[in-house]
Swiss-Prot record:
One of its GO terms (biological process) is lysine biosynthetic process via diaminopimelate. Pfam families: DapH_N, Hexapep, Hexapep_2. The keyword Transferase applies. The gene is dapH. Coiled coil: none annotated. Catalyzes the transfer of an acetyl group from acetyl-CoA to tetrahydrodipicolinate. It comes from the Bacteria. This is 2,3,4,5-tetrahydropyridine-2,6-dicarboxylate N-acetyltransferase.
Amino acid sequence: MTATKMNAQEIIQFIANAEKKTSVKVTFEGQLATAVPSSVVKLGNVLFGDWKDVAPLLEGLVENQDYVVEQDARNSAVPLLDKRAINARIEPGAIIRDQVKIGDNAVIMMGAVINIGAEIGAGTMIDMGAILGGRAIVGKNSHVGAGAVLAGVIEPVSAEPVRVGDNVLIGANAVVIEGVQIGSGSVVAAGAIVTQDVPENVVVAGVPARIIKEIDAQTQQKTALEDALRTL
């Protein structure tokens, strides 16, 4: 399913109105004394559900009261994205929240964190450990390097998100500050901190980032993407 594009106010309302859940997986021994409610899934001696629904069942265990609880969140408002219908390569360990849009043949590497409302264009790679904050937008056939940060904006509502154009390369550990726009075809050097908009087809570097040259044939050759990595 493709997420519906949401503005900041809609995201805030989505989070505020969402049922807060502490999802758990519980493996238990013994017999349950009470019927399992519809909100809990029971497969053999394993329970899946919200802790508030599962906990009363464990209090009524008969014969043996041993159980193990696995959980990864507390009162979470935003579930993780259901990735089954996404036509992209998503590696283990990537954390992608609900209401994220991912284009065809995109690549999301291990450890990437993508927050609610972010958009990733077709053929774009988000490398290991990169962070896309809330509502950050990356165009088509771009590359966000390992450890790079595209700052998110959900509050204040009036703030603008980061927008990255098509065919952009953002180097490892670069940081793009809230509201900054990166023009299509540009390159952000590794470690740069981008505090102002970047026009199309230039290279920026430094802290704060400044234009050091326009894109030339040599730069295009060095920063060319590999289509083979995006083959499904």
